Design a protein with these regions (language model features):
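Carbohydrate transferase catalytic cores enriched for Leloir-type hexosyltransferases
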Residues: 1-356
Length: 356
């Protein structure tokens, strides 16, 4: 008996797709990896949006992504009528549709518009508050979270814990990894030679780059093996100064994988975070990692040097400490093993359990 699962994929085509887009791709990939012929996974997309190579069948609504987002709270446009599960991969929706017996769920990745209100727009805050109120009012809507700490916080806004299901997130298999020589050429083209400290993520105020820059300067004066600070990723909401760091911007995936592998330390110290994929990707590569205590993805990982993101001295000491950790094959294998269960296949299994 076929079970039809409809998931929203419109996030992939927004101006700032961000981590939610990674989650959408990963969930689709994980469901496909189950190789379960009884599952028919459909992506609900906006008008004219291509599939982006996802391993699913796409259906397209007759409107653009912005109008679709405004309509979804009241009208499940684009959702197949035979769907057994309708899953909103973000607070955009949809929140209804499918069979009369369909399971409806929504993923909530964070409350960052509250945690970092100063770096959110007024319109963004209003949008998320309206959607939060809508989600809380739909008693039959299951809420899927990736940060266990959200369970208690959502209870405070009227979403009972029985409705909330915590799931893991995953990391892509490395795929192609650039050679050390190729990575060295990329870095040399930007004036970086020798060891380097790596940051991966958007460049925006919430990511706390100003403190990371200062901490790295202090730590490098203690141990020069930290090398240059290299920033990889696009600019985000709100400009930030990058000081003496080397900005590579967005790089091909194979190069990013090589940078993770070759970095002396990977540092990720946001003030607030929904989940935090880069530290997991770094561990997957076997690298030494410094991450803030506000990063849910590694909050229980003993292989990570965790620091207070608001304390420059703590970040400094964390970088210095990370360099003292082993970088031999056994140490790298241990770090890889610490995130071995964070696969998109397991993410898909967690979602299927939530949809029972």
């Amino acid at each position: 008996m076929t079970r039809t699962i409809a998931i929203s994929v419109e996030q992939l085509y927004r101006p700032q797709p961000g981590g939610i887009a990674t989650y959408v791709r990963g969930l689709a990939t994980g469901l496909a990896a189950l190789d379960d012929e009884s599952l028919d996974v459909i992506g609900v997309a906006a008008r004219g949006v291509p599939r982006d190579g996802l391993p699913l069948r796409a259906v397209h609504a007759h409107v653009g992504v912005n109008l679709l987002t405004r309509l979804w709270p009241t009208w499940p446009l684009g959702v197949p009528g035979n769907a057994d599960v309708v899953h909103a991969t973000s607070m955009a929706g949809p929140f209804a549709g499918g069979k009369s017996t369909a399971v409806h769920s929504v993923s909530m990745h964070d409350l960052l518009w509250r945690d970092e209100a100063a770096t959110s727009t007024k319109a963004g805050i209003q949008f998320h508050e309206r959607r939060l109120k809508l989600i809380a009012s739909h008693d039959d809507l299951r809420v899927i979270v990736t940060a266990p700490s959200l369970v208690g916080r959502l209870a405070d806004v009227g979403i009972e814990s029985g409705r909330v299901h915590a799931v893991r997130l995953g990391v892509n298999d490395p795929g192609e990894v650039a050679s050390r020589a190729s990575v060295g050429e990329v870095l040399a083209g930007h004036g970086v030679r020798g060891p380097f400290t790596l940051y991966v993520g958007t460049r925006e105020p919430r990511k706390n780059l100003e403190r990371l820059l200062e901490a790295h300067r202090q730590a490098r004066s203690i141990n020069g093996e930290l090398g240059n600070l290299v920033l990889v990723g696009p600019s985000g909401w709100g400009g930030v100064a990058t000081g003496d760091a080397t900005v590579l911007g967005t790089v091909p995936r194979a190069v990013l994988n090589g940078l993770y592998r070759d970095a002396a330390v990977v540092a990720y110290v946001p003030r607030a975070e929904g989940w935090g994929l880069p530290p997991v990707e770094a561990l997957h590569a076997g690298s030494r990692v410094v991450a803030s205590i506000t990063t849910p993805s590694v909050e229980d990982n003993t292989e990570v040097v965790r620091v207070d993101p608001l304390d420059v001295n703590a970040i400094t000491q964390g970088l210095v400490t990370a360099l003292t950790l082993g970088d031999d094959d056994a140490s790298r294998s241990r770090r890889q093993a610490s995130v071995a269960d964070l696969t998109w296949r397991n993410v898909a299994l967690d979602h299927l359990a939530a949809w029972q």
